[in-house]
Amino acid sequence: MGCLFSLFKGLLYTALLLLLLAGGFAGNMAYEELFHAPWDQILGIENHRRDLSQIHAMENRYGWQSVTVPSEDGTRLKGSYIESGNRNHRAVILLHGLYQNRAMCVPYADIYREMGYSVLMVDLRGHGESGGEYPDWGVHDIEDLNAWVDFLKAKDPSMQIGIHGISLGAAMALLYSGSKEGEAMKFYVADSSYASLMELGREKIMRYTGDDRLVLGMDVLNPFFQAALFVHDRKLLRDLDPLVQSAKARSPLLILHGKSDTLIPYGAAEDLFSEAGSPRKEL
């Protein structure tokens, strides 16, 4: 009887080990898919991330400064800097949307320049002329934004800095708002951000494939995916979720979102507004 019990226990441990190994393998595949999946097709958006003709033409025409800074891991980041002529120690960092580049921010730059701000339009990692082969979804964006803040502070130690992001850039701004370094920013504007990376993935994959089994599979794989994320990047999903991170924010926050937005539901903005920790916030 003891031998049978030992055999059963051994088989159970073996099965559990195989299950964990299979889960770990699948979780790592899910991690790779986060970065390499054709999100432009899944989300139904155009891919202009490497089309730099417009921004280069405007830099040449108006004499905007093309700038390069290294991030903490050595990745080269690229941006365009437009200095205000009135030296009022105010600047804004503009962050573009998914599969776009800093050229998307030009209309917003005009608004801030009229208000007397110096403007820094940057290419997010994996976009434009910045290093990286794919969207980063916030894994390194706090460090990347630190590099840009350091760039502005080196120009003017008294610089008061705000961050305005659109779509993916809005999500990155919200992640930064909850960081220790982000507390020093004077304001944040989040235009059309998603609230939860996992919820965004669930909704868009369901719409893209029409197969609810994949959504169920995401839930089953979630612990293994998070393990892979931690092994690779020392991050968990909560570190990449604007809803979670903006709850720590203390700087003034303006959330913008169109009620007819078909890419990111307006409810995401309502959730973000409800949970944001900023004492001064508007939707």
Residue ranges, per PLM feature:
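An N-terminal hydrophobic leader/cap segment in hydrolases
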Residues: 3-8, 13-70
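The serine-hydrolase catalytic nucleophile loop
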Residues: 98-111
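Conserved alpha/beta-hydrolase
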Residues: 111-131
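Alpha/beta-hydrolase active-site loop
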Residues: 135-156
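Hydrolase active-site cap/lid region
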Residues: 178-235, 244
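Short beta-strand/loop motif that positions the catalytic acidic residue
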Residues: 248-250, 255-257, 261
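Conserved alpha/beta-hydrolase "acid-adjacent" motif
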Residues: 262-268
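Catalytic histidine neighborhood in serine/cysteine hydrolases
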Residues: 274-283
